[in-house]
Amino acid sequence: MKILHIALTDGGGAGMGLMNQHRALLQLGVDSRVLVAIKQSKDATITEMRPNQNVWGSNKYVVLLQKIARRMGLSFNLYDRTHRDIYKIKKKIAIPFSSPITQYDVSRHPLVDWADVINLHFISGFVDIPSFFKNVKKPIVWTMRDENPGLGGFHYAETKQVHYKEFSELEDKFLNIKRNAIESCSNLSIVSLSKIMRQFCDGVDFLANRPNTIIYNAISPDDYTMFKRNEARHELGINPDNIVLSFVCCQFSEKRKRFAEVLEALDILGDKHIKLLCVGKRDVEITSPNVIALGSISDRRRMSLVYSASDVFVTPSAQESFGKTVVEALYCGTPVVSTSVGIAAEIINENNGALCGGTPSEIAEAIRQVLGNKYNQTEIRRLATEKFAPENVARQYFSLYNEILKN
């Protein structure tokens, strides 16, 4: 069985899930390869693809003329025009918004010919949707790592509701491009990372009638260590007598993560001994003396220290396709307070935390509830490992690939 995974990159959160799945498949004896636009590791089973040759040739003078034309706002092709239009809007509104038109004709790569099954992952900015679904006739599995496959350019439906007015023309155009491309494909199956993601797909006209299997994201427990709480606090320089909450996001200004609501919840709790550890880009002003901003962290050992030092991990997101930080915290034995989104809706219960609403008062009440309970940290980690360990996830994918090939 030859499986080709296609993704924008082997790095980042989505890339980590892909690579855990890929390596676990290799351990099962599957001939698994990865094709990316941006390679961040030295893994020999990963191939990096460069953009297509310039449509006007490789003559250096022609290339120079194109660059000058682009700076003047002129366009030679659909790729140039769509990305010029996106850039104009994103200068004013900095949100993820991607075109289905790219400079990569992935369908013609030799690894596509090599594979028995092609597994798409996060492909925004890499795979040219129209040419790929037109030319590839092999079985395709698309792992939904966010909601972009079922939208035009937006990556989350909640963001679309807020910013549709500014992007309406492009969103409608991109949605029609995707719809036409995917409707012409008879060999597509979907993998949803959670029940909520599957429900989203069921509401998209061109995805609803596709076979859709729920397989959780692969997250390795070996990457996250359950430190003793006081040891973790000592290493991070945190008072062992404090009550510690933690919060993680890419950047604090990302409204979907509800950082502002968490700060208000901290005020509602009204205890000067409660400290909030925040991981992410500090791009908003923080005046509370009870907030400890740690900046962005990529080192998994240090992230393990943050989770392990916490009495509660708080993640009241408005929307998540999966929510891997929930699993990371559970691997460290830390109970979680989360809204009922992504994977949290399925796994958070009285044994490992609490679900909450998205208002500051609801978040504060759930934090109080969790702080008032006692938890078995070892059991929290064990149950999470059963669900999300890469070897367990890989077996489910192996069964899915086999079923598709038999049919």
Regions found by a protein language model. Name each.
Residues A318:
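Aromatic "clamp/platform" in nucleotide-sugar-dependent glycosyltransferases that forms part
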Residues L305-S310:
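Short alpha-helical donor nucleotide-sugar binding micro-motif in glycosyltransferases
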Residues V191, N239-K257, L263:
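Conserved donor-binding/catalytic core segment of Leloir-type glycosyltransferases
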Residues P335-S338:
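Short hydrophobic beta-strand element within catalytic cores of glycosyltransferases
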Residues G280-S304:
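Nucleotide-activated donor-binding/catalytic signature segment of Leloir-type glycosyltransferases, i.e.
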Residues E350, A354-P360, Q369-K374:
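Conserved acidic donor-binding segment of nucleotide-sugar-dependent glycosyltransferases
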Residues S107-R108, N135, N148, T159-V191, ...:
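Membrane-proximal helix-turn-helix segments that form the acceptor-binding/catalytic region
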Residues K374-S399, E403:
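A short, well-ordered alpha-helix in the C-terminal region of glycosyltransferases
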